[in-house]
Each structure stands twice: as structure tokens, then as C-alpha cells.
């Protein structure tokens, strides 16, 4: 067995938390292994002046790390799964899906008021078209304002800027110990999360069987079933830019329930549906994702997505 493992990661506080978590979990199982981190600056860490909706988010936070992985300079890469494009580069594979944190989104507000109690025309900070679409469907009066940067930077910008509220993923807020700032946790009925939200995806080379075997011990089977279904749905619908799609899967006693949303950026058009099926394998879970994607397309999702792609 390998005596040394090099983990590639971004240098943001949340990315470092994720990498250190992975290192600690591997060290518990392989105490004699020397595990080190290699920090990689990604395009997404550099391009902070433009909204994600303008520059797209396809691999902004993963491509540069993947180059190091393909070159053999690192043995594995740890990503927020929601940042990982559904089509991984040839030669790479998501080997492990870690146990998922709470997938919901949260509201941070300066007034302490929740989403529906914010004042008329409140200024809401988010860089996500998925959140924007669902927010505007509920509160068309909101003024959506872009906010970029790592979590610590966003909190600083929010506190110092002209914002009434901000929306973030619970998982990151919790992991970096900002939970005391949460005003409201939004249920899935209100806000479906990003595909893979709350889970880590550990990526390895397909030809590195030894590392894949090592990393596989961190896999959570329930998380894999849900995330494989969500990612299959996104892959079946996805264009080349950021689009307003949300999805959440739950897998209990052999039954997978998959929810999904596709909406227009202005929130005026939104489609939701779900599929519930008994599944036994990740491949069967992916088939559920494709089935739900086809249902959404038959409901009119293609027109919504085509209109959005015209602006990409």
C-alpha cells in the first residue's frame, strides 16, 4: 500500500476545511500513511469581479486542480461536489462521495427577518441563478445583487455593503462556524439546492487503482445514490453555462425520491416534479435522474433552458 498521499485543494477556508477533513478521515483508517496538502489557485479564485452567470461556472473551481491530478503531481482532489461539472475529464473519476451535510440553503439577514418578512424591494445578495430564479418566484420585488468570493469574503462584503440579506448553503456556513449568523433555514419546498450540495467529491485518476481503493473507504453509499441521480439529471439538461436547476435526492430503505426544479432567471416560469422508485445500484439511480430530466423537458424545460443559453 502507498506510504504517501498528496491531496490537491483550493486555498479558500472552506476548501481547506474539506481537505483537512479528508486528510483526518484517511489518517484514522491509515495511521501510517503520510498525507500532505498541495494548494492550487483556480480560475474561480481569480475571476472575482464578474458574476458567475456571465462567466459560467463549468469547472472554474476544478479544472486547474484536475491538471495537477492528470500530471501526477497530486494523488487526489477534494471538491465541493456542487462545483464539479457532470462530465469529468478523460482519465479522471469521482471515486468517493462523502456523507452529506444538510443540503438546505439559509438566509442571513441584517434585520433578523426571514425571506417572506423582508421589506419590499429588499436587496438580496447571491451569485447563483438557481437561487435567483426561486427567490424571484416567491418575492418578485427583491433586488438581486451579485456577491462573489469565499465564504469569509462574502460575510465581510455583506456586513460592509448595502445589502438587506444574503443566501448561502448551510453546509459551508456550518463547517466554518458561522451558524450563529443564520436567520432562517429554507425548506426544500421553498428552495431546492444545487446538485450535489453538501457533499464532497473526491476525484482520482482512473489508472490509479491503489489510490481509488484507499479513497473508496470514505464513500457513503446513500450519498452516492442521491448524488449520482442528481448529477445524471443535470447532465441530461445541462448547457454550457450556469443555469437555474435545483435537485435533491433522498434514499431510504431502497427507495430513491428525486426532486427537481428548472426555472427562468426572472422567476416568472418554474417547473417542478419528482420521481420515486426502488433502486439497488448507482446506475439505476442515474436512470431515475434521466427519467426526471425527460419529464421536465416534456413540461417545457427545453424552452426555458434554450432562452437562457442564448445569453451565455
Curated annotation (Swiss-Prot):
Catalysed transformations (reactions): 4 porphobilinogen + H2O = hydroxymethylbilane + 4 NH4(+)
UniProt keywords, alphabetically: Chlorophyll biosynthesis, Porphyrin biosynthesis, Transferase
Essential cofactor(s): dipyrromethane
Species for this entry: Chlorobaculum parvum (strain DSM 263 / NCIMB 8327) (Chlorobium vibrioforme subsp. thiosulfatophilum)
Assembly, per entry: Monomer.
PROSITE patterns on file: PORPHOBILINOGEN_DEAM (PS00533)
Enzyme Commission identifier(s): 2.5.1.61
Gene3D superfamilies, A to Z: Periplasmic binding protein-like II (3.40.190.10), Porphobilinogen deaminase, C-terminal domain (3.30.160.40)
Cofactor binding mode and count: Binds 1 dipyrromethane group covalently.
The keyword Transferase belongs to this UniProt entry's keyword annotation: yes
Miscellaneous notes: The porphobilinogen subunits are added to the dipyrromethane group.
Protein name, entry field: Porphobilinogen deaminase
InterPro entries tied to this protein: HemC, Porphobilin_deaminase_cofac_BS, Porphobilin_deaminase_N, Porphobilinogen_deaminase_C, Porphobilinogen_deaminase_C_sf
Domain of life: Bacteria
Pathway: Porphyrin-containing compound metabolism; protoporphyrin-IX biosynthesis; coproporphyrinogen-III from 5-aminolevulinate: step 2/4; Porphyrin-containing compound metabolism; chlorophyll biosynthesis
Amino acid at each position: 500500500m502507498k506510504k504517501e498521499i498528496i491531496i490537491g485543494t483550493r486555498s479558500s477556508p472552506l476548501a481547506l476545511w474539506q481537505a483537512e477533513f479528508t486528510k483526518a478521515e484517511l489518517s484514522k483508517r491509515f495511521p501510517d500513511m503520510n498525507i500532505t496538502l498541495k494548494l492550487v489557485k483556480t480560475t474561480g479564485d481569480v475571476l472575482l469581479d464578474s458574476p458567475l452567470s456571465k462567466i459560467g461556472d463549468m469547472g472554474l473551481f476544478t479544472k486547474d486542480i484536475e491538471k495537477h491530478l492528470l500530471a501526477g503531481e497530486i494523488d487526489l482532489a477534494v471538491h465541493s461536489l456542487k462545483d464539479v461539472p457532470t462530465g469529468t475529464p478523460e482519465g479522471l473519476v469521482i471515486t468517493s462521495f462523502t456523507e452529506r451535510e444538510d443540503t438546505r440553503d439559509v438566509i442571513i439577514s441584517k434585520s433578523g427577518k426571514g425571506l417572506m418578512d423582508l421589506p419590499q424591494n429588499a436587496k438580496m445578495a447571491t451569485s447563483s441563478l438557481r437561487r435567483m430564479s426561486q427567490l424571484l418566484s416567491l418575492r418578485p420585488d427583491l433586488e438581486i445583487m451579485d456577491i462573489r468570493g469565499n465564504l469569509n469574503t462574502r460575510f465581510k462584503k455583506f456586513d460592509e455593503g448595502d445589502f438587506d440579506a444574503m443566501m448561502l448553503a448551510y453546509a459551508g456556513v456550518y463547517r466554518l462556524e458561522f451558524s450563529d449568523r443564520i436567520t432562517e433555514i429554507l425548506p426544500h419546498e421553498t428552495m431546492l439546492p444545487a446538485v450535489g450540495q453538501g457533499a464532497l467529491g473526491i476525484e482520482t485518476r482512473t489508472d490509479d487503482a491503489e489510490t481509488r481503493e484507499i479513497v473508496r473507504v470514505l464513500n457513503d453509499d446513500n450519498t452516492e445514490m442521491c448524488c449520482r441521480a442528481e448529477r445524471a439529471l443535470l447532465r441530461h439538461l445541462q448547457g454550457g453555462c450556469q443555469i437555474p436547476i435545483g435537485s435533491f435526492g433522498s434514499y431510504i430503505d431502497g427507495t430513491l425520491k428525486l426532486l427537481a426544479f428548472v426555472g427562468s432567471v426572472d422567476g416568472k416560469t418554474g417547473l417542478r416534479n419528482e420521481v420515486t422508485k426502488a433502486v439497488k445500484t448507482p446506475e439505476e439511480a442515474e436512470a431515475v435522474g434521466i427519467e426526471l430530466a425527460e419529464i421536465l423537458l416534456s413540461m417545457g424545460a427545453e424552452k426555458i433552458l434554450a432562452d437562457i443559453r442564448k445569453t451565455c
